[in-house]
Amino acid sequence: MKKISTPLTVQMINSLKSGDEILLTGTIYTARDQAHKRLSDAIKKGKKIPVVLRDQIIYYCGPTAAPRGKAIGSCGPTTSSRMDEFTPLLLSKGLRGMIGKGRRSEEVIKAIKKHKAVYFLAYAGCGALISKFIQRVRLIAYKDLGPEAIYRLEVKGLPLIVAIDSRGRSIYN
């Protein structure tokens, strides 16, 4: 398994190939449908957004509350296609990676290639297991969205699979 850390660099991303298994360490951000809509709307209106996207990763996840003594509750991946309408814009603003589950649209694949990004798969159905790789959690924005708010996660050795690499090659083909 390859070990990578955030922030992502173009050189690092270009070294990844569809199907590679990786262990990710560093900072990632959670965001689902409603957070993506708010980010997108703010960008379109020229407003400042609450997170710097450049070279960062968004995990499509809505974590549950943390049990006593844990950093986070269950935090499995959300179906990525739900974010497809917002993804090209976020990639154009410097977002470098996404974590989720399932296929992506052709428009997203083209944007991944254009902006030298990468799409990772998290293991679906393993939300409780994934939580063991998360060391710290901090609310960043949109508290009113509850689990769909944007959280900053500090992860160590999070196992992922490269689903779509920076050349647009997909494990689904």
Where is each model-derived feature located?
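Short, structured beta-strand/loop micro-motifs enriched in basic residues and often containing a Trp
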Residues: M1-L8
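Feature captures the catalytic cores and cofactor-binding loops of soluble hydro-lyases/lyases
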Residues: T30-A31, A35-L158
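Active-site/ligand-binding-proximal alpha/beta "capping" segment
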Residues: T87, I161-N173
